[in-house]
Amino acid sequence: MDTTAVASKGSTNVGSSTDTLSTSASLHPSMNAGSVNEYSEQQRHGTNSFNGKPSVHDSVGSDASVSNGHNNHNESSLWTSGIPKALEEATKSKKPDSLVSTSTSGCASAHSVGYQNIDNLIPSPLPESASRSSSQSSHQRHSRDGRGELGSEHGERRSAMDGLRDRHIRKVRVSQLLDLQRRRIRPADHTTKDRYGIQDFNFLQTLGTGSFGRVHLVQSNHNRLYYAIKVLEKKKIVDMKQIEHTCDERYILSRVQHPFITILWGTFQDAKNLFMVMDFAEGGELFSLLRKCHRFPEKVAKFYAAEVILALDYLHHNQIVYRDLKPENLLLDRFGHLKIVDFGFAKRVSTSNCCTLCGTPDYLAPEIISLKPYNKAADWWSLGILIFEMLAGYPPFYSENPMKLYENILEGKVNYPSYFSPASIDLLSHLLQRDITCRYGNLKDGSMDIIMHPWFRDISWDKILTRKIEVPYVPPIQAGMGDSSQFDAYADVATDYGTSEDPEFTSIFKDF
């Protein structure tokens, strides 16, 4: 049986939604002091609310997901275990890079920011697709066959036709792949209720804490495998009017089944608490890795973005909007693949739109800030923010002043560093599009507009989905299954789990 781990770092979120648990990142060095884009964890998770005061929810989001090693994978790391020493030395001497400032209208100006480009620290690229190489060889073949000017034109036309044909074949293959993955969903009558009890687990340590409770690393007393259990206090959920969101989280996780989404194995409750048994992700948060590296090389960011895209496409096809995409909610399993965790903000939708103001301020779409009804397109906006932050080391609209942050988002003007490739800028300009009728992911072809974008030309989507691609980073898991070294240590406190005295709210949470 495959199990994977769950514990995601919470951040200050705005609006009313299920307050899930939090786990701090391992290391968050401040970005280049004195830079016009200084950005630290404290600033990211500080006074982020519409009134400039700390949010009512001190932390929102947590789970922990990691594989227990029961899948066969043919993978090896492009990095050595852990963060290379060369990376640490390189980041000590950063040279400023110029930026190109653009908005949806294509304006440009010059700025500077001190972030070190670390592309040379990743020795090997991700595999390139066969379609790209075949197109290039076709172009070379027909160029050689040309005789004079007419022959050259003929060769160029043939090369262009071959390119269109290869693109069409690639699009058909990816469409078939997406159709297959979208059908994987648990039956509607699948239940998680009372599959386990408190007596089935040995509680080892705390992985994260939050407003509603804690996340614990546990070991099963039956199969000896490791899991993460999220414990939520019923009274706090009721007092903060989060009953519906909590029940939605349980229902959604009980239905979804995807390689890049955490698994909910079962739920149970005692008199005072709700328990959710999920994967344990031993590799820690992507946020922690990003802070250690300052920013990712393009090939690395592209790899993680591809796994997120497949997961979002799956959720959207099954009428689920995620609403809280950010590096803190992306965990690495022991093999280096992502797991999306923390579905406290996720919502089932069909033809109706969402209205709740929720999410992480830096990642909020403009339609959410404007208090307008919104749909799944908000997730694709967040994808654009995620890709930008992975490439640059900071989100595109960041400001220390919360109100200025929201103004920046509504204005939609993005400053692209000079080291961003033209393809990445083009993709981001279509994702960070204020007009949802023009935003990639929300158009006629849906996620295919993103998947088929030239920035992903060298991505083999079938290998991504089947996890048969070489990962850019393998977490340094040294103690084997159950290794929690990639998470911060928390002080354990006495708990009264398992009590049966004075049961509260049992009828409200009857599906747990």
Swiss-Prot record:
Binding site residues for ATP: 207-215, 230
Record text on activity regulation: Activated by cAMP.
Chain ranges of the AGC-kinase C-terminal domain: 457-512
Region described as Disordered: 1-79, 118-166
Keywords on record: ATP-binding, cAMP, Kinase, Nucleotide-binding, Phosphoprotein, Serine/threonine-protein kinase, Transferase
Highest taxon in the source lineage: Eukaryota
InterPro entries: AGC-kinase_C, Kinase-like_dom_sf, Prot_kinase_dom, Protein_kinase_ATP_BS, Ser/Thr_kinase_AS
Biased composition (Basic and acidic residues): 143-166
CDD domains: STKc_PKA_like
GO cellular component assignments: cAMP-dependent protein kinase complex; cytoplasm; cytosol; fungal-type vacuole; nucleoplasm; nucleus
Biased composition, class Polar residues, residue ranges: 1-15, 32-52, 62-79
MF GO annotations: ATP binding; cAMP-dependent protein kinase activity; protein serine kinase activity; protein serine/threonine kinase activity
Catalytic activity: L-seryl-[protein] + ATP = O-phospho-L-seryl-[protein] + ADP + H(+); L-threonyl-[protein] + ATP = O-phospho-L-threonyl-[protein] + ADP + H(+)
PTM-bearing positions, type Phosphothreonine: 356
Bias kind Low complexity: ranges: 16-27
Occurrences of domain Protein kinase (ranges): 201-456
PROSITE patterns assigned: AGC_KINASE_CTER (PS51285), PROTEIN_KINASE_ATP (PS00107), PROTEIN_KINASE_DOM (PS50011), PROTEIN_KINASE_ST (PS00108)
Gene Ontology terms: biological process: adenylate cyclase-activating G protein-coupled receptor signaling pathway; adenylate cyclase-activating glucose-activated G protein-coupled receptor signaling pathway; negative regulation of gluconeogenesis; negative regulation of induction of conjugation with cellular fusion; negative regulation of transcription by RNA polymerase II; positive regulation of microtubule depolymerization; positive regulation of protein export from nucleus; signal transduction
EC number: 2.7.11.11
Active site (UniProt): 324 (proton acceptor)
Top-level enzyme category: transferase
Family from the record: Belongs to the protein kinase superfamily. AGC Ser/Thr protein kinase family. cAMP subfamily.
Protein name: cAMP-dependent protein kinase catalytic subunit
Organism listed in the record: Schizosaccharomyces pombe (strain 972 / ATCC 24843)
Designated gene of the protein: pka1
